[in-house]
């Protein structure tokens, strides 16, 4: 999937995101401004296939986006619920590294790995934090 095809797909499903569509649009605009590779770290993964209006699908959205960017772009996600990780792995591509466990420990270890590898995180997303993005 190239960037044009990503936006064709995203524009088709955007209405299913409800009020979150504006935030995801802003996120992807921001990511478009960054050089490859795009590295996204997420806490709390997709939990139910097709649940765009609820708490999920960010993992799928980020998966499709990073696939469209290519060049080593990747998503790292962690969830403490093994069932959620199982469902997530059934929906997303191998471009998403899924980890079962406590996010604090996972993020600490991932940070150490990224320091050694000199990997820069493009975007951090957590379903546990609610924030307001200024939409202009």
Task: Spell out what each predicted region is.
Residues 1-136:
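A short alpha-helical cap/connector motif
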């Amino acid at each position: 999937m190239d960037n044009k095809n990503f936006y064709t797909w995203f524009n088709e499903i955007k209405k299913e995101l409800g009020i979150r569509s504006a935030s995801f649009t802003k996120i992807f605009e921001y990511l478009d401004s960054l050089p490859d590779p795009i590295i996204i770290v997420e806490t709390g993964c997709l939990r139910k296939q097709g649940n765009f209006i609820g708490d999920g699908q960010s993992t799928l959205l980020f998966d499709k986006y990073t696939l469209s960017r290519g060049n080593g772009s990747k998503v790292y996600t962690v969830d403490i619920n093994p069932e959620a990780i199982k469902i997530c792995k059934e929906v997303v591509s191998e471009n998403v590294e899924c980890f079962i466990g406590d996010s604090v420990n996972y993020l600490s270890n991932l940070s150490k790995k990224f320091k050694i590898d000199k990997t820069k995180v493009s975007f951090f997303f957590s379903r546990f934090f609610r924030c307001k993005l200024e939409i202009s």
